[in-house]
Amino acid sequence: MSASTAAPARDRLRIAIQKNGRLAEPARSLLAACGLSWRQSRDKLFCYGESLPVDLLLVRDDDIPGLIADGVCDLGIVGQNELDEQASARRRAGLPAAYHAVRGVGFGQCRLMLAVPEEWDWQGVAQLAGKRIATSYPAILADWLERQGIDASVVELSGSVEIAPRLGTADLICDLVSSGATLAANQLKPVELVMESEAVLAGAVREPADARAALLAMLLRRMDGVLKLRDSKLLMFRAEQGNVDALRRLLPDADPLVQLPDDGNGALRLQTMCHGAVTWQRLEELERAGAQGLMVLTVERSLA
């Protein structure tokens, strides 16, 4: 099916995620936190939604943008780098991308960087002129080189990019970097950022207009509730009225304080949602400012 052909009416939503790799487990955990559960097929590539009519496809990450563009899947969790690479390649071929990033999902952060042999005296991007750059992201790199006004050769490799300079097939590389350990092991050093990336929920530009529309809206609302509270804690305590302003100043990253019904002990009962780290040091600071009976609770989900 071409990207311009309307997808057939369906009453079940389909989501594609990476079968194996660094995004697989976080993606599945996020969807499970949204209330989804599945029955796995024998080939372990298709998971039938049991709690809701939302099915899961387990595929290679570089297949996900195409599955969305062709209407096979409605959504996918994939790296922004993979999404941009295929969108750029489609534009260069005169095709519409037909998909976009709907939400960042808070994991899979990495950087696409240029890396050169350690012995290079890096002076800046002007050194790239006439050089051969190995990468698995040729379209992103070509776009970046054009923006920099640099004429260099792009050597496309599907894997083991970091070994290309030692093999003599390239002078330097453009590859994803997380910790930098792989670069160091291959006597390379990162020198220039090409793009920041993270995992995103991707969807078709044209949203479904059939029964899937309500499922999509519900899923996005649930996901927002999970993501908003992922690093948040519910903080509950008692305090005298005269200490409330000082306590509020110690909670700049928290929602407004909410007063709960009086428990008969004279002090106010208060609670708030903290969106930053609630450390022992922070609790002790609040205690010194007059907070009593401090409790920190984990919140899994919310409907705002």
UniProtKB/Swiss-Prot annotation:
InterPro entries: ATP-PRT_HisG_long, ATP_PRibTrfase_cat, ATP_PRibTrfase_CS, ATP_PRibTrfase_HisG, HisG_C, N-reg_PII/ATP_PRibTrfase_C. Signal peptide: none annotated. The keyword Magnesium applies. One of its GO terms (molecular function) is magnesium ion binding. It catalyses: 1-(5-phospho-beta-D-ribosyl)-ATP + diphosphate = 5-phospho-alpha-D-ribose 1-diphosphate + ATP. Its EC number is 2.4.2.17. GO terms for biological process: L-histidine biosynthetic process. Keywords: Amino-acid biosynthesis, ATP-binding, Cytoplasm, Glycosyltransferase, Histidine biosynthesis, Magnesium, Metal-binding, Nucleotide-binding, Transferase. It is an enzyme of class 2 (transferase). It holds the Pfam family HisG. The keyword Amino-acid biosynthesis applies. Pathway: Amino-acid biosynthesis; L-histidine biosynthesis; L-histidine from 5-phospho-alpha-D-ribose 1-diphosphate: step 1/9. Its cofactor is Mg(2+). Feedback inhibited by histidine. It is found in: Cytoplasm. GO terms for cellular component: cytoplasm. Belongs to the ATP phosphoribosyltransferase family. Long subfamily. Catalyzes the condensation of ATP and 5-phosphoribose 1-diphosphate to form N'-(5'-phosphoribosyl)-ATP (PR-ATP). Has a crucial role in the pathway because the rate of histidine biosynthesis seems to be controlled primarily by regulation of HisG enzymatic activity. HAMAP family: HisG_Long. This is ATP phosphoribosyltransferase. It comes from Xanthomonas campestris pv. campestris (strain 8004). The gene is hisG.
